[in-house]
Design a protein with these regions (language model features):
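Hydrophobic N-terminal alpha-helices or hydrophobic patches in metabolic proteins across all domains
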Residues: 1-257
Length: 257
C-alpha cells in the first residue's frame, strides 16, 4: 500500500487547500515559530545563535516526527504529507482573480487586464515547483526507505524558514532549481494537452516557458492577447504535469516497495 502514499497525499492536498487556501500561511507561520523557538534554545550567553545547529535540530525534529507518524501506516503517511503539497492553494487564488477579471473590473484599462492575466499565469510555475514537484520527488526518493514523509516535511521547513535563515534559503533554492528544471521538461512534454507544439515554445525558466506555451509571452511565441481563459489553461496544464509525474514516480517505485 505504500505505493499509494504519493498519489493519495497529492489528492488529499486538493481536498485541503482548495477550500482552505489560507492553511498554507498558517503552516508556514507555525514552522517559522517552531524554528524561532529552537534558535532561542541555541542562543549563547553572548546573544549569538548557532544558526546552523539550530536549523539542523529543527529539521531533525520536524522530519523525525513526520517519519514516525508516516511509519504507522501508509494512510497516515498520506495524511501527514498532504499539507506539504501547497500548490492547490494557488488554484483557489487564481479562481478569485479570474472572477474579478470576468466581472469587468479592468474594462477601462486593457493593459492592466493583460498584465494581471500574465502575472497570474506566471505565478503557477513557482507555486507548482515548490508546492508540488519538489516535495513529490523527495517523497518518492524517501519512500523505499520509509523516509518519504521526513524528506517532504524537511523541504517544507526549509522553504518556510528561507526568509530568516540564509542556510535554509541556500538549500531550498538548490532543491527548487533542480525541481524547476524537471518541471520545465514536464511542461514541454505536456504542452500538447493545451494544443501547443513543443518545438514552437521557448523560455529558460518555468515562468517564461509556461507563458510561451500559453502563447501570451512577449516575443515570437506570442499567439494572442492574454485573456482570462488562459488562467484556466495554465491551471490545467500544471495539474496535468503533476498527475503525469505522480504516475511516473509510482511506476518507478512499484518494484521498490
Amino acid at each position: 500500500m505504500r505505493i499509494l502514499t504519493l498519489p493519495a497525499s497529492f489528492l488529499l492536498a486538493f481536498l485541503l487547500y482548495l477550500p482552505f487556501p489560507s492553511v498554507v500561511m498558517l503552516r508556514d507561520r507555525a514552522l517559522c515559530a517552531l524554528h524561532a523557538r529552537i534558535v532561542r534554545l541555541f542562543t549563547g550567553k553572548k546573544g549569538r545563535a548557532d544558526e546552523k545547529a539550530a536549523l539542523a535540530f529543527f529539521l531533525l525534529a520536524l522530519s523525525g516526527c513526520a517519519a514516525l507518524i508516516g511509519a504507522i501506516h501508509p494512510l497516515c503517511a498520506a495524511v501527514i504529507c498532504a499539507p506539504v503539497f501547497s500548490a492547490p492553494a494557488c488554484l483557489s487564488l487564481s479562481a478569485s482573480v479570474k472572477r474579478t477579471l470576468d466581472s469587468g473590473a479592468f474594462a477601462d484599462n486593457f493593459s492592466d487586464y493583460e498584465a494581471q492575466v500574465r502575472e497570474t499565469c506566471a505565478d503557477f510555475a513557482p507555486a507548482f515547483v515548490t508546492g508540488a514537484c519538489a516535495p513529490m520527488v523527495l517523497l518518492a526518493i524517501g519512500t523505499p526507505l520509509y523516509l518519504g514523509s521526513a524528506l517532504a516535511w524537511a523541504y517544507a521547513g526549509l522553504c518556510a524558514c528561507a526568509a530568516c535563515c540564509p542556510a535554509a534559503r541556500r538549500i531550498s533554492e538548490a532543491i527548487s532549481r533542480a525541481a524547476e528544471s524537471l518541471f520545465v521538461v514536464l511542461l514541454v512534454l505536456c504542452c500538447g494537452a493545451v494544443g501547443r507544439n513543443p518545438l514552437r515554445t521557448d523560455g529558460k525558466g518555468a515562468r517564461s516557458r509556461l507563458l510561451s506555451i500559453l502563447g501570451i509571452a512577449d516575443g515570437e511565441a506570442r499567439t494572442h492577447a492574454p485573456v482570462s481563459g488562459d488562467i484556466v489553461q495554465a491551471a490545467f496544464l500544471c495539474c496535468f504535469c503533476m498527475v503525469l509525474l505522480a504516475v511516473l514516480l509510482s511506476l518507478v517505485l512499484l518494484p521498490l516497495v
